[in-house]
Design a protein with these regions (language model features):
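Alpha/beta enzyme core
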Residues: 1-59, 64-106
């Protein structure tokens, strides 16, 4: 897209961008750390965006553990996107499905 990523240290800019997207009529917000990122979107960012917006919130990039996935859900993500990790470790898919089901039934 040739867009410039916002640094995770600038939570205010990220929140304001998400608010602007919602005000412009976007149907969802996707917080993306980058495909195969070393560090996922922080819980603080997810929480801050969730508190200021009401559209569905998707979070992805850099999620490689079930803990990172459930942390994203706890922080306010409606959907967690995991891609590259499963390309390299498809055998872990059942673990993530079980963790998501366990989280959803709490």
């Amino acid at each position: 897209t040739h867009s410039t990523p916002l640094p995770q240290t600038d939570i205010s800019a990220i929140v304001h961008t998400a608010i602007a997207a919602e005000l412009l009529g976007k149907d969802l917000i996707y917080l993306e750390a980058g495909s195969g990122a070393k560090t996922p979107v922080s819980r603080g960012i997810i929480r801050a965006v969730r508190e200021q917006t009401s559209v569905p919130l998707l979070v992805g990039g850099g999620i490689c553990t079930t803990r990172q996935m459930t942390d994203a859900y706890r922080a306010g993500a409606d959907i967690v996107v995991i891609g590259n990790h499963f390309e390299h470790h498809p055998e872990q898919l059942p673990l993530f499905i079980q963790a998501q089901n366990d989280y959803a039934t709490r």
